[in-house]
Amino acid sequence: MNNARPIRRALLSVSDKTGILEFAKSLHAQGVELLSTGGTARLLADNGVPVIEVSDHTGHPEIMDGRVKTLHPKVHGGILARRGIDELVMEQNNIKPIDLVAVNLYPFAETVAKEGCTLADAVENIDIGGPTMVRSTAKNHKDTTIIVNASDYDRVIVEMNANEGSTTLETRFDLAIAAFEHTAAYDGMIANYFGTQVPAHSKDECHHDSKFPRTYNTQLVKKQDLRYGENSHQTAAFYVDSPSFNGQGDEASVASAIQLQGKALSYNNIADTDSALECVKEFSEPACVIVKHANPCGVAIGSDLLDAYNRAFKTDPTSAFGGIIAFNGELDAATASAIVERQFVEVIIAPKVSQAARDIVAAKANLRLLECGEWNTKTTSLDYKRVNGGLLLQDRDQGMVGLDDVKVVSKRQPTAAEMKDLMFCWKVAKFVKSNAIVYAKDSMTIGVGAGQMSRVYSAKVAGIKAADEGLEVQDSVMASDAFFPFRDGIDAAAAAGISCIIQPGGSIRDEEIIAAADEHGMAMVFTGMRHFRH
């Protein structure tokens, strides 16, 4: 084949030595001459693989404690030489072609993540020769093969076996893309780290100043193309965090979930599933969250998942049609059967799905069934919000109050049952679009008022939703994601039958708001924490 390039000489120099010995043995078996450096060379030699030290190949020793090893014309000339063009120059300078380079870089991300890492530690783990070889080889992909991921070793060996020791241009180009992605991520990590440091009193040291660097670099990997975006006239794709760059690859999420069956996820499916899953993750007892247009329309805790689903559905059966359902436990056969017999649903997501449940859901071939895995801790990460010409970055809202954090500000103390419902209601309100009002009773939402421009209207909407579904508001509790600016919201809640309110507090009219609650005989609890969601 015209674009095939034989591999006769390879340079191997890796920090992560996973699979490198087996790869080197396979190359040697095909007659490939091996060059290497430092620890990689020692590993090969100790295991009987013939290897030439790069310093012997170049005729120049490693210097400056290994800082300069591969930065030499005999290395980069051998990599960058254009086959069929540069042979005379190579002969005049005694440069031998290097056909394959396998390199991965110093572990910068792991180093700076360690507690007590100093700037000096970070600097010594900035790879120079490695990225230079990677970029050189990727640039000359027409003639040379670059490998930066151990997962590609077998792929290259298989192709060489099938092509008389050669690689194809298609493979070399694909590997070159991976190489440039690799070096882009690496430099981005370094820029992010340095961008959060400020000089300290010592000229050789810095200290951490901010989690927000001067320039923000990240890397996302395309998971799938989507049929269209939020609307049919918009094109779209779904990108996920690169685990090597962002270190979040193992978090249970819609991004890491495995689709077990159903049609391809749409743009809106993904956004709504994220909202549902993140909400249900707040609960430790068996819980179900039903979401429509990014807002919870039904949330409940139950004795088991079936009970939780039945109660969540009861909140708003109308809105639940075509919704997204999330659970915080293994989806079982009884719950799956209840769902498919009762309603049309776009997506079901759970940490685990039993085989019996899978068999039942299979009757609805288009229903998207996702398994996201268990979650144990909350991962620290950032939220992004795109604005025209810029990007807003903030910590993810992982704040949540407990019983010991809230303050009763009314004359009447909430009962134990009311306080339990307040905690439940507050968790739900965190995931409702502002202005958010949630009515709840017995660990089940009664009405949800979302996205109204005034808080009092959100309260009215919650009441209307409850009335439309025949749910009794009397003696329910209410959560508000932000403070009440006026007493009208309290008056509306009292008129609807609300007995107790949880809200952040912090209004200049707090005294007036508390007085209104006392006037109506309501209990009121302040959290001191707001949960705006836009």
Swiss-Prot record:
UniProt cross-references to SMART domains, sorted A to Z: AICARFT_IMPCHas (SM00798), MGS (SM00851)
| Gene Ontology molecular function, alphabetical | IMP cyclohydrolase activity; phosphoribosylaminoimidazolecarboxamide formyltransferase activity
One Gene Ontology term from the biological process aspect of the record: 'de novo' IMP biosynthetic process
Q: What's in the keyword line of the UniProt record?
A: Hydrolase, Multifunctional enzyme, Purine biosynthesis, Transferase
* Annotated InterPro entries: AICAR_Tfase_dup_dom_sf, Cytidine_deaminase-like, MGS-like_dom, MGS-like_dom_sf, PurH-like
Pfam families attached to this UniProt entry: AICARFT_IMPCHas, MGS
Query: Cross-referenced PROSITE patterns, in alphabetical order?
Result: MGS
Q: Catalyses which reaction?
A: (6R)-10-formyltetrahydrofolate + 5-amino-1-(5-phospho-beta-D-ribosyl)imidazole-4-carboxamide = 5-formamido-1-(5-phospho-D-ribosyl)imidazole-4-carboxamide + (6S)-5,6,7,8-tetrahydrofolate; IMP + H2O = 5-formamido-1-(5-phospho-D-ribosyl)imidazole-4-carboxamide
Q: Does the keyword Hydrolase apply?
A: yes
Q: Known CDD domains for this protein?
A: IMPCH (cd01421)
Domain MGS-like, first and last residues per copy: 1-148
Enzyme Commission (EC) number: 2.1.2.3, 3.5.4.10
Pathway(s) served: Purine metabolism; IMP biosynthesis via de novo pathway; 5-formamido-1-(5-phospho-D-ribosyl)imidazole-4-carboxamide from 5-amino-1-(5-phospho-D-ribosyl)imidazole-4-carboxamide (10-formyl THF route): step 1/1; Purine metabolism; IMP biosynthesis via de novo pathway; IMP from 5-formamido-1-(5-phospho-D-ribosyl)imidazole-4-carboxamide: step 1/1
Instruction: Indicate whether Transferase appears among the record's keywords.
Output: yes
Q: Which GO terms describe its cellular component?
A: cytosol
Query: Domain text from the record?
Result: The IMP cyclohydrolase activity resides in the N-terminal region.
Family of the protein in this entry:
Belongs to the PurH family.
The protein's name in its UniProt record: Bifunctional purine biosynthesis protein PurH
Name its species: Shewanella sediminis (strain HAW-EB3)
